[in-house]
Amino acid sequence: MTEPTTVYANTSQLIAQVEPDFPSFLFSKKELHRATKVFKKGFDGLLTYAVKCNPSPHIIKQLHEEGLKAFDVASNTEMELVRDYAPGAAMHYNNPIKNKREIERAYNEFGVRSFTIDHPQQLDQLAAVVTPSRDIEVTTRFKAGKALKS
């Protein structure tokens, strides 16, 4: 992890010692553990963390160590983070905007097998890269309002 890490007992200690005049990333292993436990207890489905909301290696690594087995990724950069800090975790590529090269890397380099499309052209892009296989999951999104007006 390339982010410098300094441990403080709490936020007040950080403010007293550093007096930061810049945005600071604060990470509480204890709080993340608590929140993860609450989610796991209250939801027995597949929990998937959206890397886009906070792509910190510290968070991805701890979530994986706590048993999170899937991550929602929106770019090849996010896939690299998951590969490096949550090895073996499933990745769901739900970003509707992706080009052929990104799809190729997702499938061939990062092992992504779950894709989301919201336009027929995206299915063509996916089909050009991925050979028909039973190990691929494609979720289709559409706007009901537009579909119903047609």
Name every feature range the model reports, one short phrase each.
Residues V129-P132, A144-S150:
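Active-site loop/helix belt of alpha/beta enzymes
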Residues E137-K143:
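ATP-grasp fold ATP-binding core
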Residues M1-I136:
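A charged N-terminal "starter" segment
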